[in-house]
Structures are given as C-alpha cells and as structure tokens.
A protein has these predicted regions:
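Thiol-based oxidoreductase modules, predominantly thioredoxin-like and allied folds used
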Residues: 9, 55-74, 85-96
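Short active-site loop/helix that positions an aromatic residue
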Residues: 77
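Non-globular targeting/processing and membrane-anchoring segments
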Residues: 1-46, 52-56, 60, 80-81, ...
Length: 171
C-alpha cells in the first residue's frame, strides 16, 4: 500500500491504518451517499441495516467500517435516522480512497474491499464486484457473493427482486 488514506469519523480524523484498530483484517463497505445525494442509496442503506445485529459477532474477528463521500455530519445524521448504534461510519472527503478502490471516476458507486495488515504492512486482499456487468436485464447490479440476506431471500421466490421495487429509507 503506497498511500495512507485519510478519513473523517465520528471521533475525528483517522488513517487507513487506524481503521484496523487491533485487528489484522479490515473490511470497508463503501456506500452510495456522495455529496450530491440528498439521501443515501436505499439499496445500500438496506444492506447496511442487515449488519446492525451481526457487527458484534463479526468484529470479534475483524474490523468492519462503512465509508461514503458525503461529509461526516450527514453520515452521522443518516445513521441516527436508521437507529444504528454499531456502525462505524467514515467520510472520504478527498475522494482518494474512493477513486483508488471503488470508482476511478469518483462515481457514486458501492464497493466492498478487504485489507490485511501483517507485520505493519497493509495489503489489499479482495474486492467484491457490483458493476453494471453483473446486472440482470431490468435489475440493479448484484454482488458475487451477494452478502445481503434481503436479496438472498427474494432471489429464491417467484416474484424475485422486482423491476421497480427498492427498500424504504424509513418504516
């Protein structure tokens, strides 16, 4: 890793190294909530909601954070609106991390990246792919593997995901 990316979190500034905490593996889910968006992406928000109950289990073994391009105050506001207490949210204000690991064009796109830290060296281990090439006709792109139980369940039904249905941002 040649750059030490800088993020803004609820507790202040943090580097990529800081995001690991005391773990050797870090997962960063980049969600679609760029500065041009009024609200976060409903699909990303739904996916993130599935982690609220599981983060304590996951974080026994790895560090898991959520990154978006909007200012940290907006990320915190959206987190509170959903009632999330366990999500560690960070802003990528410069866009450096997003351009290097999610979208070279700095597009408002989701991303799932795994990093390792061994002997003080950070390496990129794995990325999930959810680009347009993974979309079925009339559908949004799907990740492989699809980590969201909402889609895993709907994909087993005759109705499927639906062409125009999105999860709600409030219930």
């Amino acid at each position: 890793m040649t750059k030490n990316y800088s993020f803004e979190g609820e507790g202040g500034n943090a580097t990529l190294q800081d995001l690991f905490g005391n773990k050797q593996t870090l997962v960063i889910y980049s969600y679609m909530f760029g500065p041009q968006r009024e609200k976060p992406c409903p699909m990303c928000t739904s996916f993130m909601g599935t982690w609220e109950a599981k983060l304590p289990d996951v974080e026994q073994r790895i560090a898991f954070v959520f990154v978006a391009r909007s200012p940290i105050a907006r990320l915190i506001e959206a987190k509170k609106a959903r009632g999330w207490t366990r999500h560690k949210v960070y802003s990528d204000p410069s866009g450096d991390y997003t351009r290097d690991y999610v979208s070279a064009a700095d597009a408002d796109a989701p991303g799932y990246n795994v990093f390792t830290r061994r002997d003080g060296t950070i390496r990129h281990f794995w990325s999930g792919e959810t680009g347009r090439a993974t979309a079925d006709p009339g559908q949004d792109p799907r990740g492989a593997p699809d980590l969201d139980p909402l889609w895993a369940v709907l994909d087993t039904t005759p109705e499927g995901r639906g062409k125009d249905w999105y999860p709600s941002l409030s219930y």
